[in-house]
């Protein structure tokens, strides 16, 4: 079964210039914050690092990908953020080397160290980006892919979806050993 999307899913309000390079990474940052809460580690996080890969890295500054992830990590919503507040938020991060994570707690954040532009591509998709949260006793990493139109996916979800489609196409799977066992009485293979 294919997922249906409406015109409201495709046409989004958000800061540009590119839904794949700006809105997608921003939404990925929001999802990462939710994961930190779900994992129960949000309040323990002392640092966040962002790795941009492939196309997001190569055109990231020109398409404001770096700004988008900072705004997303700051808890700003791309649909409702006052446009005139964006430059102030970014300037504050630059000047103080701190980020207000999820608009709830301040952590150290140095743009030059904590946003990494990797020239290599991740194998799954050209627009990959990874967030790593560091906290006392560990780290939590999550990789997202901006697939266009502001849509963001995780590789695990796509793989699970592909497996489900295969299962539907072949509802009665059979392996080689079972096939050999079934064909033995007739000696036909």
Spans of features found by a protein language model:
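A structural-propensity feature for long, helix-poor, extended segments
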Residues: 44-81, 93
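Conserved phosphate/anionic-ligand binding catalytic regions in large, soluble enzymes, centered on
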Residues: 11-29
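Short coil/turn connectors at secondary-structure junctions
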Residues: 4-8, 42-48, 66, 126-128, ...
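Hydrophobic alpha-helical hairpins/lids featuring a short glycine-rich hinge
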Residues: 93-166, 172
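Ordered, amphipathic secondary-structure segments that act as subunit-interaction surfaces
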Residues: 76-88, 98-102
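Short, hydrophobic/aliphatic alpha-helical segments
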Residues: 1-14, 50-52
């Amino acid at each position: 079964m294919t997922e249906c999307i409406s015109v409201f899913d495709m046409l989004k309000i958000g800061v540009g210039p590119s839904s794949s390079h700006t809105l997608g990474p921003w939404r990925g940052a929001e999802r990462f914050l939710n994961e930190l809460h779900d994992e129960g580690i949000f309040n323990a996080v002392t640092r966040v690092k962002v790795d941009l890969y492939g196309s997001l890295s190569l055109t990231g500054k020109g398409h404001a990908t770096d700004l988008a992830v900072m705004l997303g990590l700051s808890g700003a919503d791309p649909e409702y953020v006052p446009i005139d507040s964006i430059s102030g938020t970014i300037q504050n991060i630059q000047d103080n080397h701190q980020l207000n994570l999820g608009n709830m707690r301040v952590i150290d954040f140095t743009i030059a160290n904590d946003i990494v532009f990797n020239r290599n591509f991740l194998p799954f998709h050209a627009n990959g980006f990874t967030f790593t949260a560091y906290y006392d006793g560990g780290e939590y990493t999550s990789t997202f892919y901006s697939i266009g139109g502001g849509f963001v996916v995780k590789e695990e979800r796509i793989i699970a979806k592909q497996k489900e489609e295969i299962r539907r196409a072949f509802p009665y799977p059979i392996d080689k050993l079972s096939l050999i066992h079934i064909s033995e009485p007739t000696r036909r293979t």
